[in-house]
């Protein structure tokens, strides 16, 4: 576990009007919570998109022709990077605002809490976490619960049990 302050650079862009969307400071707080104790230095980008762009990216990169809530694109460490040279670039997150809003409504969740959950979920993917099998999924979900609890956000999986 990494201790000490985190140097964090989060570039946030909005591909649609910001009204009703979380402020950049909220996204930064959620990212910092996900990284706390795990990594000391990180650069990443978050892009909040509409359904059309979300669908296009999901189709292009995952072969799935629908908009999804969050896409994670981990950075690749350049080959031949000298040992000891830091490479703080984590990658990019794409969050599809209409999908997040629809899911929050359908699941009876506060919109900001759902954005926080999906941001944390996406950052964990950038750190190498996955949920391809039940054991991985449970471990990742438990970590998400712990991070969100530190942010004062209820268990996002409580209604699924």
Curated annotation (Swiss-Prot):
Q: Which UniProt keywords apply?
A: Cytoplasm, Endonuclease, Hydrolase, Metal-binding, Nuclease, Ribosome biogenesis, rRNA processing, Zinc
Documented EC number(s): 3.1.-.-
Q: Which Gene3D superfamilies match?
A: Metalloproteases ('zincins'), catalytic domain (3.40.390.30)
Q: Which GO terms describe its biological process?
A: rRNA processing
Q: Where does Zn(2+) bind?
A: 121, 125, 131
Q: How are cofactors bound according to the entry's free-text note?
A: Binds 1 zinc ion.
Which SUPFAM superfamilies does UniProt cross-reference here? Metalloproteases ('zincins'), catalytic domain
Q: Where in the cell is it found?
A: Cytoplasm
Report which superkingdom the organism of origin falls in: Bacteria
Q: Name one GO molecular function term.
A: zinc ion binding
- Belongs to which family? Belongs to the endoribonuclease YbeY family.
This chain belongs to the protein called: Endoribonuclease YbeY
């Amino acid at each position: 576990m990494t201790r000490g302050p985190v140097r964090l650079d989060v570039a946030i862009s909005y591909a649609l009007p910001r009204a009703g969307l979380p402020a950049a400071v909220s996204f930064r707080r959620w990212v910092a919570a996900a990284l706390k104790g795990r990594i000391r230095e990180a650069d990443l980008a978050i892009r909040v998109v509409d359904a059309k762009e979300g669908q296009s990216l999901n189709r292009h990169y995952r072969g799935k022709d629908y908009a999804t809530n969050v896409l994670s694109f981990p950075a690749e460490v350049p080959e031949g990077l000298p040992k000891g040279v830091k490479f703080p670039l984590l990658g990019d997150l794409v969050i599809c605002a209409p999908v997040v809003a629809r899911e929050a409504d359908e699941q009876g969740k506060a919109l900001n809490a759902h954005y926080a959950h999906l941001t944390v979920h996406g950052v964990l993917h950038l750190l190498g976490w996955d949920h391809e099998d039940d054991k991985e999924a449970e471990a990742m979900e438990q970590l998400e619960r712990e991070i969100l609890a530190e942010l004062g956000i209820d268990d996002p999986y409580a209604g699924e049990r």
